[in-house]
Amino acid sequence: MMEHDVEDLINQLDISEKAMLLSGTDLWHTAAIPRLNIPSIRLSDGPNGIRGTSFFNSSPSACFPCGTALGATFDKKLLFEVGEYLAEEAKAKGVSVVLGPTVNIHRGPLNGRGFESFSEDSTLSGLAASYVILGLQSKNVQACIKHFVCNDMEDERNSVSIDVSQRALREVYLMPFQLACKYSNFKSLMTSYNKVNGEHVSQSRILLDNILRKEWEWKGTIISDWFGTYSLKKAIDAGLDLEMPGKPRFRNVNTIQHLVGSKELSESILDERAKNVLKLVKHSWQNTEAENHCELNNDSSCLREALKKFASQSIVLLKNKKKLLPLSRKGTFAVIGPNAKVCNYSGGGSANLKPYYTVSMYDGIAAKIDGVPEYALGCHNYLNLPNIANLLVNPRTGKHGYVAKFYLEPATSENRTLIDDYDLEDGVVRFYDYCNDKMKDGYFYIDIEGYLIPDEDAVYEFGISVFGTALLFIDDVLLIDNKTKQTPTNHTFEFGTIEERNSIYLKKGRKYNVRVEYGSAATYTLSTNLSPSTGGRYSIGCVKVIDPETEIDYAVRVAKSVDCVILCVGLTAEWETEGEDRKTMTLPSLSDKLVYSILQSNPNTVVVTQSGTPIEMPWISEAHTLLHIWYNGNELGNALANIIFGEQNPCGKLPITFPKKLKDNPAYLSFRSSRGHCVYGEDVFVGYKYYEAVEREVLFPFGYGLSYTTFELSNLYLKNCGERLRIDLEISNTGPMSGAEIIQVYISQIVRSVNRPVKELKEFSKVVLCPKETKLIRIELDIKYATSFYDELNEKWCSEEGEYNVLVGTSSKDIALTGKFTLPKTIHWTGL
C-alpha cells in the first residue's frame, strides 16, 4: 500500500471499486481491493477500551476509565499515556481505527451517554481529546473522534433536530472538535445521528464541507455513525466518505454506478470520497492485518498498573471535613451498599465490553486490610434484574454460566440440526454479529440450560427481555412467556421487549433446572425496521427477593458493629447507557434512605458515590466524608482502595458541575425532543457558565476536588507576547503529604459588547509537589482562542479590544490570583 500514492491508486480504480470503498463490508471492516494491494482495515469501539470485532462471545479487553473519569484527571501527560495504552490494545486486536474519543458536551445531567464524554467545558473536552489522540497516533493507531456534532442526548437521537444558535454551535459544541483538529490533526471523524438546525449532520454540506473541510482545512476521513446514514447522493455530495456498517443501506455498488453513468452523481465527487478512505487506509498501513486477524490477550502487570493509575487519579475527594481520610488499616471495617460487590466498571451501550478481569470496591478494600470486611447489600439498585449467569452453574463445566446450544429448528421440532454449542458466562448476550453459514434468513434457536442451587429458602424473581422470542422454564414448568405476547421497549440500543418477570419460591440446597428456549430476531413478533440478520439479543436476570426495610435494618446492624464503614452507592451501566437518557438525577431505589440510615449509625462513614454524570445528594449535609468515583475500568476497586488508605493522594477534579437538584440545571426545560425538535435555549451558558451567570448555588462546582494536603498559589506575573499570553506563578505544597494540584486559568472580558459568560476555562496544568516544595509554573495561552467569541453578524470569530481579567485558581469557584491584560485592537478571524 505504501508503495503507491493515493492519487495514483484512484486513477487505477474503476467506478465499482471506488464505490466499494465508500461503505463497510461488515460491522467492523472497510473494503479491500486485492487487485491493487489495498487492504481492509478494522475499526472497533471505542472510547474506554477496544472490544474487537464481536458483540457475541467477544474476546476480553482492558476497560479504561470512562470519559468523565479521564476528564477529571485534567492531566495532559496522563491522557497521552491513555492513548498509548489504548493503541497497544488496538494492535492486539488487529484494529487500525479506534472509535473515540467522545467529545460531546455535558449540556445536562441526564444524557445516557454522558459518561463517555469528558466534560461540560469545551476547552477541557478539546484538549483532553487532543492528548488521547496524540497518544494513539504515536503508536500508529488512528482515532475517530465523535460524535460530530450536538449528539448530547439519546432521546429520538436519529430524528431529532438540535436547534442551536450559530454562536453556541461554534463556541460550545464545535469547539472540542476544532481544538482537537488544531492540536492533534485527527485522521477520521464520526458524524452524529441527529439533525442540527433541521438537517442530518451526515448529509450537511455546511458542517462537513464548509466548516470541517474548507474553514478548518481538515483532510481526513468522515465516517457515519453505525446506521447513521440517511441518503445516498446527498450524503456523498455533502462529504460523508464512509457509510458504516456494511452491508450498506444506501451505497449499493450498482446504484452508485448507475448514478455516475447517468450524471446524477459526479465521478469527481466519487473520487474525493474514495481518496479520503484511501488516506485512512494509508495512515493505518502499519497496523493493517487480514480480516481474520486473531484477537490477542494483551493483559499484563504493566497494563494493570497503568489502569490503576488512570483510575486513581480520576477519583475526586468532595468532602473530608473531619479528616477521616486517609484511613488507617487497623480496626474493623464494613463495606456496604449495592455498588460494593458488583464492579460497575463501565457504562452501557457500545462503550461496554468484556473485561479481562474486574476488581470490585469490596475486593479492593478487602485486599488492603488484615481481616475480612463485613458486608451488607443495604438495598438493590438494578433497573432490570441482575445477570442470571452469576447464579447459574453450567452442568458441563461446574462453573458459573450455562450451556447454549444453537439449532436451525425450534424446540418444538423433533429432528433438530445442531449448528453451534457454547459455554457462556453472561446472561446478557447480543447476536448482532453472530454468523453461521447454515443459517437461513436469520433464523436460529438456542436451548439455554443451567442449574441454580439457592442458598436459603426464598422467593426468587426471574426476568427476560429479548429482541427475538423466549420461554423460561424452571424444572420444565413454564415461568415466563416472552413469545406469545410481547411488549416493546423504548430503548434505542437494546432493541426488543421490556423485561417480562415472574417469581417462584425455591428451597435451600435443592438443584433447580433453569431452561430457556430462545428464538432469534427473525422470530420477533413486533414490528421493527431492523433486519432479522441482526440476530437479536436476550437478557436473563434473577434475584432473591428481599424485604427492603429488613435489608436496611441488617445494614445498620453491620454498620454499628465495626469501627469504620465504606458505603458504596450510585448508578450502573443500566442507568447510564447508550439508547436511553435518565429521567431523574436521584439515586435508584432506596439508596438515599440507606445513606441516611448508615450515616446515623456510624460516625466513621466514608460515602463513595459512583456515576458518570451528576446525581442528587439530599443527605449531603450529614456526610462529612465523600469520594466520587466514575466507571473506572478493570482496576476500579484497587484504585479506590489506594485513595482510601492513602497510597495515592486524591487529585481528581470535577469536569462537570453537580447541581443541587435536577431543576437547577440549564437544560432542564429543553432536554428532550419535543415533536422532533430540541431547542438549546441556554445558548452559550452551559454548565458552570450558566450557574455563575444566574448566581445559582450548586452542590459542587466545576473543577472542584480536595486533597490530603494543602496548596498555595502566589506571585502571578503576566506578559503579553503578541499571539501568546505568558502566565507565571508559584505554587507551594503547604501540607504534610506529597500531592498534585490542578492550576486552572479562566479568562473574563471586563467590558463586553455581547452577553458572555462570567469567565471561561482556557488552560490548565497539573503540578506534583512534595511536602513544603514550591515550584515556578509557566502557562501559555493562545490569545486569539482565549479572548474570542463567535460574531454571528460577521460570521467570524471576534477577539475584541479591551481589558481582560486572568483568573487563576483550583476550581471555577476557588480563584486565588487575578491579573489583567489589554488587547489594543479588535481582530476577526476564521479557520484554526
UniProtKB/Swiss-Prot annotation:
<keyword id="KW-0963">Cytoplasm</keyword>
<feature type="domain" description="PA14">
    <location>
        <begin position="397"/>
        <end position="556"/>
    </location>
</feature>
<dbReference type="Pfam" id="PF00933">
    <property type="entry name" value="Glyco_hydro_3"/>
</dbReference>
<dbReference type="InterPro" id="IPR026891">
    <property type="entry name" value="Fn3-like"/>
</dbReference>
<dbReference type="GO" id="GO:0009251">
    <property type="term" value="P:glucan catabolic process"/>
</dbReference>
<keyword id="KW-0326">Glycosidase</keyword>
<dbReference type="InterPro" id="IPR001764">
    <property type="entry name" value="Glyco_hydro_3_N"/>
</dbReference>
<dbReference type="InterPro" id="IPR019800">
    <property type="entry name" value="Glyco_hydro_3_AS"/>
</dbReference>
<feature type="active site">
    <location>
        <position position="225"/>
    </location>
</feature>
<dbReference type="InterPro" id="IPR050288">
    <property type="entry name" value="Cellulose_deg_GH3"/>
</dbReference>
<dbReference type="Pfam" id="PF14310">
    <property type="entry name" value="Fn3-like"/>
</dbReference>
<comment type="similarity">
    <text>Belongs to the glycosyl hydrolase 3 family.</text>
</comment>
<dbReference type="InterPro" id="IPR002772">
    <property type="entry name" value="Glyco_hydro_3_C"/>
</dbReference>
<dbReference type="InterPro" id="IPR013783">
    <property type="entry name" value="Ig-like_fold"/>
</dbReference>
<dbReference type="Pfam" id="PF01915">
    <property type="entry name" value="Glyco_hydro_3_C"/>
</dbReference>
<dbReference type="InterPro" id="IPR036881">
    <property type="entry name" value="Glyco_hydro_3_C_sf"/>
</dbReference>
<dbReference type="GO" id="GO:0043231">
    <property type="term" value="C:intracellular membrane-bounded organelle"/>
</dbReference>
<protein>
    <recommendedName>
        <fullName>Putative beta-glucosidase</fullName>
        <ecNumber>3.2.1.21</ecNumber>
    </recommendedName>
</protein>
<keyword id="KW-0378">Hydrolase</keyword>
<dbReference type="GO" id="GO:0005829">
    <property type="term" value="C:cytosol"/>
</dbReference>
<dbReference type="InterPro" id="IPR017853">
    <property type="entry name" value="Glycoside_hydrolase_SF"/>
</dbReference>
<dbReference type="GO" id="GO:0008422">
    <property type="term" value="F:beta-glucosidase activity"/>
</dbReference>
<dbReference type="Pfam" id="PF07691">
    <property type="entry name" value="PA14"/>
</dbReference>
<dbReference type="InterPro" id="IPR037524">
    <property type="entry name" value="PA14/GLEYA"/>
</dbReference>
<dbReference type="InterPro" id="IPR011658">
    <property type="entry name" value="PA14_dom"/>
</dbReference>
<dbReference type="InterPro" id="IPR036962">
    <property type="entry name" value="Glyco_hydro_3_N_sf"/>
</dbReference>
